[in-house]
């Protein structure tokens, strides 16, 4: 089989064939995986006639080449082997098609051959241009290479705005390839509901997702909010042809939902999705032919609950709905259901098994648990969630909630301000392969979660969690981390950019390095560029009261700042900043959303 670096292969099916009446169980292990390639699962037990699948993933650090992967089956004294010829291929062209580069949300662009620690400095690197647009760019821009537009091949930068517009630019020339409005006839963008979180208008807030294989030319998917002439609000899922910007068949799809529940704001035994009460802030997740959406409120304006929805990529029809707080009663402070999903604009994370991971915000959590350790009423406010998509149906599969979650919710110190990042497979001190995720919110702690056993809820301790780093982020996280060379990088509110190395599947309990500068509210979501494991650069945007600063650091020593956009004379590299901006790197350039453009940084001519 073949794998592309940064990609996931088709499942490999293993079957134990019974001979001479054999009916035992065969324990299968595998060996020979090349560096940077992981398998899930790595061990399994086969019964005759009951096949199981193994999925291979080539991470960003994988190298192109071939390998022989050996499956060894043992049952009693019997041993049998089978060999899989595995080819790891280099990525064909440059594509950044989803938030933070991939569904693990690690923010690692590993194919950068132009930008290096040697040439990123204010003498040779800076702002090349700004691509003007008609509103704020809160979503991360996306990038595709060799896109056919009007019979010509272009690299393309996909940009969406809070004015409800979507653009394609040629990032090399700065020319506009197409522009479309997602607003319906006689509609405007939504007002900001008197809330300063997304202001002064709400159009397209979420980072879209691109599927280059969909339809004749590929497609870009996003959610847009609007308001009609009768002051009714609309949320719609759009699918645009990547080459033309035209709406594809079935697009747009009006978003509506109900879910059984009797909590605050319910009607006749159901929670009903009110499009005016919500914003699609998180980045969209495309996984196994389904597009997943998560919803947040406007400044905690009740009533609202936590909604997760799935839509068919092919039809844009809704396939599944999960409400995270359907039965939350009306209570003081942060009760009333609530439990929204916003994560500072980070994308919902997804693993190779089809599970979704995210953190939800303050809201009702039922501390009365059923026999499986789940909230008896199905209310999961202020939790680190794992949601199964088996059969394209959303269902809570596991979770972690802190022992003091109620007091944290009451004090607005919940987990929901930060995003979840999935780590590559790691081996602990006992040789056990661990599948981990990392997340942090407002409470200043970093949580390292075992995705196979997240820890659930204990009212007196967090000991069931894989690892907790209390107070590691002095001001909390309104952002998410990035990952490079076995190190997690965080930039919390009012804190420095910090490097936490990983050894034996555990984070260092204190940072190995940190930046000299700190990041004011809301902190920063860093990204990383590298050529494989070499020439790494950590990129982060600082908000200085509306004036943005792009920083570049040496990942091996964050105290060594390579560049910042205030260094050049006469404001050459200045730009205005939005609150939750994630830098995107592709093909020798860095892209940063501003209040009315995308700032493009690269090597100066």
Model-assigned labels for residue ranges:
Residues 378, 470-475, 518-521:
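Long amphipathic alpha-helical scaffold regions
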Residues 458-473, 511-516:
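Inter-blade linker and blade-boundary elements of WD-repeat/beta-propeller domains
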Residues 568-569:
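Contiguous ligand/interfacial binding patches
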């Amino acid at each position: 089989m073949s794998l592309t670096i940064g990609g996931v292969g088709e499942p490999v099916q293993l079957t134990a064939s019974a001979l001479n009446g054999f009916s035992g169980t065969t324990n299968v292990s595998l060996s020979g995986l090349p560096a940077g390639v992981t398998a899930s699962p790595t061990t399994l037990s086969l019964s005759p006639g009951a096949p199981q699948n193994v999925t291979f993933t080539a991470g960003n650090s994988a190298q192109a080449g071939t390998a022989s992967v050996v499956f060894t089956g043992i049952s009693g004294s019997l041993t049998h082997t089978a060999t899989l010829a595995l080819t790891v291929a280099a990525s064909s062209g440059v594509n950044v098609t989803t938030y933070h580069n991939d569904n693990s949300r690690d923010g690692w662009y590993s194919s950068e051959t132009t930008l290096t620690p040697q040439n990123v400095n204010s003498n040779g690197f800076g702002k090349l241009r700004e691509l003007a647009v008609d509103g704020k760019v809160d979503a991360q821009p996306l990038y595709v290479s060799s896109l056919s537009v009007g019979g010509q091949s272009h690299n393309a930068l996909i940009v969406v705005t809070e004015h409800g517009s979507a653009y394609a630019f040629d990032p090399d020339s700065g020319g506009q390839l197409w522009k479309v409005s997602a607003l319906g006839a006689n509609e405007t963008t939504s007002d900001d509901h008197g809330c300063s979180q997304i202001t002064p208008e709400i159009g397209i807030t979420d980072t879209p997702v691109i599927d280059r294989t969909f339809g004749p030319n590929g497609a870009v998917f996003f959610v847009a909010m609007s308001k009609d002439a009768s002051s009714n609000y609309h949320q719609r899922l759009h699918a645009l042809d990547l080459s033309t910007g035209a709406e594809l068949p079935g697009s747009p799809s009006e978003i509506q939902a109900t879910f059984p529940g009797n909590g605050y704001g319910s009607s006749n035994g159901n929670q009903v999705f009110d499009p005016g009460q919500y914003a699609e802030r998180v980045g969209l997740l495309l996984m196994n032919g389904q597009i997943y959406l998560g919803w947040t409120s406007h400044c905690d304006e009740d009533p609202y609950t936590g909604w997760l929805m799935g839509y068919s990529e092919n039809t844009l029809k809704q396939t599944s709905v999960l409400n995270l707080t359907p039965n939350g009663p009306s209570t003081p402070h942060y009760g009333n259901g609530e439990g929204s999903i916003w994560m500072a604009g980070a994308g919902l994370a997804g693993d190779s098994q089809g599970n979704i991971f995210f953190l939800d915000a303050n809201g009702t959590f039922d501390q009365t648990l059923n026999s499986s350790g789940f909230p008896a009423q199905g209310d999961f406010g202020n939790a680190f969630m794992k949601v199964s998509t088996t059969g394209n149906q959303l269902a809570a599969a596991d979770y972690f909630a802190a022992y003091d979650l109620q007091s944290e919710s009451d004090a607005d110190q919940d987990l929901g301000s930060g995003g979840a990042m999935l780590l590559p497979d790691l081996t602990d001190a006992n040789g056990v392969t661990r599948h981990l995720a990392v997340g942090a919110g407002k409470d200043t702690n970093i949580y390292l979660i075992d995705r196979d056993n997240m820890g659930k809820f204990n009212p007196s301790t967090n000991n069931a969690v894989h690892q907790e780093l209390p107070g590691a982020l002095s001001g909390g996280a309104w952002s998410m981390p990035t990952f490079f060379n076995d190190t997690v990088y965080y930039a919390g509110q009012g804190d420095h950019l910090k490097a936490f190395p990983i050894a034996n599947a555990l984070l260092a309990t204190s940072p190995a390095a940190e930046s000299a500068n700190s990041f004011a509210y809301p902190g920063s979501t860093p990204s990383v560029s590298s050529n494989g494991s070499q020439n790494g650069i950590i990129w982060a945007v600082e908000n200085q009261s509306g004036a943005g600063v792009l920083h570049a650091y040496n990942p091996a020593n964050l105290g060594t700042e390579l560049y910042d956009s205030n260094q050049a004379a006469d404001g050459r590299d200045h730009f205005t900043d939005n609150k939750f901006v994630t830098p995107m790197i592709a093909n020798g350039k860095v892209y940063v959303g501003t209040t009315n453009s995308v700032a493009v940084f690269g090597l100066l001519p």
